[in-house]
Amino acid sequence: MKAMEGKIIQVLGPVVDVEFESYLPAIFEALDINFEVNGVQKSLVLEVAAHLGGNRVRAIAMDMTEGLVRNQAVKARGKMIEVPVGEEVLGRIFNVVGESIDNLEPLKPSLTWPIHRKAPSFEQQSTKTEMFETGIKVIDLLAPYSKGGKVGLFGGAGVGKTVIIMELIHNVAYKHNGYSVFAGVGERTREGNDLYFEMKEGGVLDKVALCYGQMNEPPGARNRIAFTGLTMAEYFRDEKGLDVLMFIDNIFRYAQSGAEMSALLGRIPSAVGYQPTLAGEMGKLQERIASTKNGSITSVQAVYVPADDLTDPAPASVFAHLDATTVLNRKIAEKGIYPAVDPLDSTSRILSPQMIGEKHYEIATGIQQVLQKYKDLQDIIAILGLDELSEEDKKTVERARKIEKFLSQPFFVAEVFTGSPGKYVTLQETLEGFGGILEGKYDHIPENAFYMVGSIQEVLEKAKNMKNS
């Protein structure tokens, strides 16, 4: 159709203005450009972002725009960007437009879905709350995840967000036999590469679909990759009735790329230079991550916190949507305790006796009280020393130090760094161990025996070995 052809009238970095003779493409419609750069044939996908008046549109490029010139031919697709869905996407890596980028045989999809879809309606959504066991002690005990809930992993650079995500993918594949979708939103290419090979080595690759829009790509690709991954997860939920795990690393980059796109489209920025539509854009993505009567999408989103400032508009806009927060703390990482989850800052909506049962709730709040008391006593200890404390406070400090150590755990995906085999700890074992510490059952065991182990049984074995050596 000649009418659906247009031409480039302006190229502004990743933004391209296109004019059509008699056709006006809809917002979110895909446009295709086939061109040649230095004798190499290239194709580029654009997505319509704004109507400029007349038959002119402003579109965001999903790849680099080098080599584009004015008056070049552009073809409208008449539909949105569509990506492959179904079991054939498992074990493969895709870019934002659904092309496989893992150097394997190109995928010829039998089914594709558009990346912009409506969120499930109120009637379709499920209101049932169930705990999702992760096998990670500190999470299951103090900030449990709910099936079909949204979890934020908060932390600055280099405190271990990606390692926790990899461990969760591992545990879901091995223990729950479930599918996962991983969306790499504006993160390091090296990390994406490492993740792929580690999953291949760990034998979990056939249970996960990977979608990457990395740091070096234009903002359009970094922003829309979250929708590409989500669409693949929605298929497993809606058509197959499965419980899927959706990982987004990093949701901050989704907001950041939205800010870049907004500025390029000429919108006036709001606080801290973010886009004026930040809350709406975040809601559009988050509302699609939901549990329906068919299946669920449980999502874990790593949230980079710029300069460790939780009041920054980007992390603040994510907070509103979360059911649980897992906050990583650099001070805990500096003590050598991994995962460096802050037991007092991390929260969960389901940490209540009605949702998780009286026993779990009592142990969790008991642990938090001991840790809080220890935190309050630290100023006194720093000034006067441990000897000035009452006998009861000394006991609290001893138990708190054991709890801190026992909250550490060797991960399967970190075996290569730590040399310790990974451990999956069931909720039952976790409650037994921490309940015993609170009751004073293990007051006679040295605190070093609690460090980097799985269940309390291992603590007792380690203490026995320490005594004998």
Curated annotation (Swiss-Prot):
SMART domains (alphabetical): AAA
Positions bound to ATP: 155-162
Entry membrane topology: Peripheral membrane protein
GO molecular function, one term: ATP hydrolysis activity
GO CC annotation, single: plasma membrane
Key word Cytoplasm present: no
Annotated S-S bridges: none
Subcellular location: Cell inner membrane
Reaction catalysis annotation: ATP + H2O + 4 H(+)(in) = ADP + phosphate + 5 H(+)(out)
Keyword list, A-Z: ATP synthesis, ATP-binding, Cell inner membrane, Cell membrane, CF(1), Hydrogen ion transport, Ion transport, Membrane, Nucleotide-binding, Translocase, Transport
EC code: 7.1.2.2
Superkingdom, taxonomy of origin: Bacteria
InterPro entries, alphabetized: AAA+_ATPase, ATP-synt_VA_C, ATP_synth_F1_bsu, ATPase_a/bsu_AS, ATPase_alpha/beta_chains, ATPase_F1/V1/A1_a/bsu_N, ATPase_F1/V1/A1_a/bsu_N_sf, ATPase_F1/V1/A1_a/bsu_nucl-bd
PANTHER family documented for this protein: ATP SYNTHASE, ATP SYNTHASE SUBUNIT BETA, MITOCHONDRIAL
Family to which this protein belongs: Belongs to the ATPase alpha/beta chains family.
Assembly and oligomerization: F-type ATPases have 2 components, CF(1) - the catalytic core - and CF(0) - the membrane proton channel. CF(1) has five subunits: alpha(3), beta(3), gamma(1), delta(1), epsilon(1). CF(0) has three main subunits: a(1), b(2) and c(9-12). The alpha and beta chains form an alternating ring which encloses part of the gamma chain. CF(1) is attached to CF(0) by a central stalk formed by the gamma and epsilon chains, while a peripheral stalk is formed by the delta and b chains.
HAMAP family: ATP_synth_beta_bact
Chain's role: Produces ATP from ADP in the presence of a proton gradient across the membrane. The catalytic sites are hosted primarily by the beta subunits.
Protein name: ATP synthase subunit beta
Organism, as annotated: Helicobacter pylori (strain G27)
Gene: atpD
